[in-house]
A protein has these predicted regions:
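SAM-dependent methyltransferase
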Residues: 115, 131, 135-198
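A short acidic, Gly/Pro-enriched loop at the edge of an enzyme's catalytic core
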Residues: 94-101
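Residues lining the SAM
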Residues: 105-106
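A short glycine-rich, Lys/Arg-flanked "PGG" loop and its adjoining helix->strand segment in the class I
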Residues: 118-130
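C-terminal lobe and adjacent flexible extensions of AdoMet/dcAdoMet transferase-like proteins
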Residues: 194-233
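Class I SAM-dependent methyltransferase SAM/SAH-binding core
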Residues: 49-91
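Conserved class I S-adenosyl-L-methionine
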Residues: 1-38
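Class I SAM-dependent methyltransferase "Motif I" SAM/SAH-binding loop
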Residues: 44-46
Length: 233
């Protein structure tokens, strides 16, 4: 499983502005109208940036993440307004109860081998009743097929060297922070049809695919991420 370092959080996650999160939550709310979808499971919730805004809108949120630093930050920010647990997504079935909605945002899916990735989806499907929804925000494989190699860029005054390569269907990203530290991440990456087909096997019917958290924007190899909304049959 990928483990995000404190340096990564400081450079990439903590730097996300509230306006971006608000746009993403507006999309989620359009796809999850209250009161039909109230109880939300936010898988890999990170620092709770989506959970906080969803709670403000009246959703009952449980967030899980394996990163203790992220959960501690989320608990501090939400101050008891959501249930936030240090919990592995591979054990979703151990969580109490069911949910009206499961979220998996910010390229959190695909960290494991194909069998384990499928089992994570299977556990999510089992936590949903017919008519409940699952929203997935992941990388579009086509985007990275033409953007591999090594480049250096500036982020918050630091020079980061980023290397990307594809190994079969897996994207490998290595970050060098220039101070002897770095991060390495690896994910199975999909086309829209591939991930929709995988979900279909588990009784999750696709109701929307888009990009930029905008229903009017279609997924494209020109855009790094895509969002898919599934409904339990």
């Amino acid at each position: 499983m990928d483990v995000y370092s404190p340096t990564w959080f400081g450079l990439f996650m903590d730097a996300i502005d509230a306006a971006q999160t608000a746009r993403e939550v507006e999309f989620l709310a359009r796809q999850l109208p209250l009161p039909r979808h109230v109880r939300v499971l936010d898988v890999c919730c990170g620092t709770g940036r989506h959970a906080a805004m969803l709670v403000e809108r009246g959703y009952d949120v449980m967030g899980i993440d394996v990163n203790e630093r992220a959960i501690a930050q989320a608990r501090s920010a939400l101050a008891g307004r959501a249930t936030l647990l240090i919990h592995d997504m591979r054990r979703i079935e151990q969580l109490d109860g069911s949910f009206d909605l499961v979220l998996m945002l910010w390229q959190s899916f695909g960290q494991f081998d194909d069998a384990t990735n499928l089992d994570v989806l299977r556990q999510i499907a089992r936590k949903l009743a017919p008519g409940d929804r699952f929203i997935l925000d992941i990388y579009h494989r086509g985007f990275f097929e033409t953007r591999l190699g090594t480049r250096a860029h500036e982020k918050l005054g630091r020079t980061i060297t980023e290397s990307k390569r594809l190994a079969d269907d897996r994207l490998v990203v290595e970050l060098d922070y220039g101070d002897g530290t770095g991060d390495r991440f690896e994910w199975r990456v999909f086309t829209p049809d591939e991930i929709a087909g995988l979900a279909r096997q588990l009784g999750l019917h696709e109701v929307l695919r888009c990009a930029e958290f905008d229903e009017a924007v279609s997924p494209s190899p020109d855009r790094a991420r895509m969002q898919l909304v599934f409904e339990k049959c």
